[in-house]
Every structure is written in structure tokens, then in C-alpha cells.
């Protein structure tokens, strides 16, 4: 077992015995601190600034050492606002990296980057803590079995299946439905797999964090009456936090997930919304630390920072962490260094398309751009692979024909192409699905569709058995039987109108 959580007991020294330094310089969220000769803190040590500001308000700021500058000075990044700090203030070296509470006590609670509860539900049992910086598991501890992680979402399970213990990227610009998809996945996984989730809200909107919390309480993922029965722990470092907090909140969430995997030997889901904000926070801090910017103004250490986070997210012989990461794509440009670096670590990508969202097809997952290393006949089986390939071919042909249709109209197409277009439009609509978490907006009850049902449905559309049904019947339904029932209802309605 890799993890060695520290158990704080009577033997742990108090802050009073620690080395004291003084603030020498403050540049926004970055502090330079002078220490006595020979008493320098280590890289990643947590420093605490306590005192009162000019108005007499209590100050308690935790920082993390990033650089040793020479001349007995260190440069540290603050994890909370530096308002009210002045030069000459006392700084305490805690002698250890940031450590956060782990284990069952974290379920149903909301934490900040320091592992402090921020949900006004009282203190958390902090007897078991783990440092947020740790090396990735050794090769010999990794589990190499390949298996599919069923999500109950048709377009995902069929065309870009997720790997159990893999890393999945949700790509998309602003407002195409990433967060709703993440909420649906948390909901489905808690209900269908009974798994524990850790949600890391990295640099996103506070309102969304609050909505997600309320949604989880309503759906029973968080059990207010008995928090121990909750299925998720939440860690937030939102947009209003300084870059230091946004840069480290992902590691706090990951540390909590690692404990469930290594000590409790569970399968864990780690959601990160949004991994781009992790990179962005690193880039904000990087220039203040005096590093030369790299491509497009990003930090030169971009690949290293990303690697140190991603390599810890993996399956071991004890358990697995399956990670689903929302990736904001700046200006919808997939070649931007932030999404491009993220791509290198992923087993599957779910790309959300603005075009599909504009058509009202939700989830707006692009069937041609989304990929998965799991979509191979030896892993998913011949039937699944064949069906997925035929769905992609039909969608691709429809895409190629769209220019001709726009200029000349459908009548100019050959009989075969017209049939392809009709089936592709049915497929496009059948890839949409009502979500449990969107019931409030849509009014239609959510649907969980098993993989076997999904394959059966698409095989029927491709075989031509359902060519006579109107394409509207396939829109926002669960399995194929619902589509045929909807077609009958539509027919009855149209007759009654006449």
C-alpha cells in the first residue's frame, strides 16, 4: 500500500516551535519571505502568516514555497487573498507540505484547497490527513486490465466508450453543456455503480458549484440526514480565488480520491471541472515567479505540471480512479497548448459541438470528433465495433453531402444517398437523450440506457427496418422501443388534427 496518511496525535509539534521568517516583498499572490540563516523551509512547505491588518481584522493566510531565491529568502504562492498583508509580518514555517483530511469523513462535505470545510456544517474529523504532493504509483503497482465503464449515455457508450480507471476529456467551448454532462455522469455512476466520487471545482463559477451541491442534495447523491451515506466529496477553488488556490485545488481533490483507492480499495470517480483553469492558474503564477513565458504566453513548465497531476490518476491493484475532466477550449481552438497538452494524457475524448447544441441535440457530443482508445473489436467485441463504425460512416457521409443539399436540395441526390441522409438524421436525433439532471428544464424524465439496448437500437436504424418512422420520433428518447412508441403517438396526433 502506497499511501501513508499522517495521523495527528499528541506527538505532533505545535506551530510555536516552528521557524519564523518575515515578509520581505509582496507582489499580488506571491510573497518573498526572509528566514534566519540555516533555517530555510523546503520546496512545497506550507507557510502560515498570522496577525492583524491595519483595521485590526484577523489575518490567516497559508502559502506554499515555490522557489529558494538565495540570500536566505524564499518565494511562496498564497492560497488565499493577500489583502492586508504588510512587509515585516511574521511567517511561520509549518515544516511540512499542505495536508488535507481524507477518508469517509470527507463524504457529503465541501472543502477548500486547504481541506477546510466551507459548508457551515461544523468541523471534519481531521485525524487522518494526507499531503497533497505525492509521487505517482510505481509501474509494478499499476493494473493493466482493459474494461469498459458503462455510463448509460448512448452516444458515449457506443462511439467513445470510457475505460475503467482511464482519463476522459470533455472538450467544448463556453455554453455547450459540459457541466450538465458531468452532473449526469455523477448521478448515473452513483445510482448504477454505487461508486464514490470526488468533484474538484477548479476555477469555475461559484454559482455552478452551488447549483451542483443543491442538485446533489435533491437527487440523494449527498444525504443530508446521514452524511456518511453520501457518494461524493466536493473540493472547490472557484474563479474568485487567487491563482495559488486554483493551481492546487485539483491536487487536494486527487489526494482525497487516492485515499479511497489505496486504503479503502474502492473504485473512485474523479471529476475535474475545469482542467484548463488549472493550467491558467499555473500560467498566472508562473510570470510572477519570474519564469519566461512559453508558447501563447503559457508557463514553460506546462507539460511537467500537467504530468505530475495526470500520472497520479490511474488504476492500481488496490482500486481505480476513473477521471472525467472538462476541458474548456479557448476560442474553440483545439491546437491551443492547454487542450493540446491535455490530449496527450487521455484515453477517450468527448467533444461537444456548438453546431449540435444550436440544433437542440443534447448531449451535444460530436459523433465524429469524439474518440476512444477502447473502441477496438478485441476490447468491446465485434458487434459493438461494427455498429459504431457504421454509425460513424453514415454520419460522415451525411456531413459530406450537406454542401450539395444546401446548394441543390435533397432531390438532386441519388436514391442511395437520400436513404443515407434519412438514416443519418434519425441517428443524429437518436444520439440525443433526456438527462435526469435536466428534468427541471426539459420536463421529460431522464433515461439510463444500457449498452446492449444502445447497440440494438442503432442496428435497427442501420438495417432499414425503421425507415418508415418520422425522424422526430427518435428525438430525446431512451431506447429504440420508446422511439417506435413515440412514432405511433405522433401519427395519432397528426390524424386527430386533421
Curated annotation (Swiss-Prot):
Keywords: ATP synthesis, ATP-binding, CF(1), Chloroplast, Hydrogen ion transport, Ion transport, Membrane, Nucleotide-binding, Plastid, Thylakoid, Translocase, Transport. GO terms for molecular function: ATP binding; ATP hydrolysis activity; proton-transporting ATP synthase activity, rotational mechanism. Gene3D superfamilies: 2.40.10.170, Bovine Mitochondrial F1-atpase, Atp Synthase Beta Chain, Chain D, domain 3, P-loop containing nucleotide triphosphate hydrolases. Signal peptide: none annotated. Its EC number is 7.1.2.2. InterPro entries: AAA+_ATPase (IPR003593), ATP-synt_VA_C (IPR055190), ATP_synth_F1_bsu (IPR005722), ATPase_a/bsu_AS (IPR020003), ATPase_alpha/beta_chains (IPR050053), ATPase_F1/V1/A1_a/bsu_N (IPR004100), ATPase_F1/V1/A1_a/bsu_N_sf (IPR036121), ATPase_F1/V1/A1_a/bsu_nucl-bd (IPR000194). Its main location: plastid. GO terms for biological process: proton motive force-driven mitochondrial ATP synthesis. It is an enzyme of class 7 (translocase). It comes from the Eukaryota. It is a peripheral membrane protein. Transmembrane segments: none annotated. It catalyses: ATP + H2O + 4 H(+)(in) = ADP + phosphate + 5 H(+)(out). ATP binds at residues 172-179. GO terms for cellular component: chloroplast thylakoid membrane; mitochondrion; proton-transporting ATP synthase complex. It is found in: Plastid, Chloroplast thylakoid membrane. Produces ATP from ADP in the presence of a proton gradient across the membrane. The catalytic sites are hosted primarily by the beta subunits. Belongs to the ATPase alpha/beta chains family. F-type ATPases have 2 components, CF(1) - the catalytic core - and CF(0) - the membrane proton channel. CF(1) has five subunits: alpha(3), beta(3), gamma(1), delta(1), epsilon(1). CF(0) has four main subunits: a(1), b(1), b'(1) and c(9-12). PANTHER family: ATP SYNTHASE (PTHR15184), ATP SYNTHASE SUBUNIT BETA, MITOCHONDRIAL (PTHR15184:SF71). This is ATP synthase subunit beta, chloroplastic. It comes from Ceratophyllum demersum (Rigid hornwort).
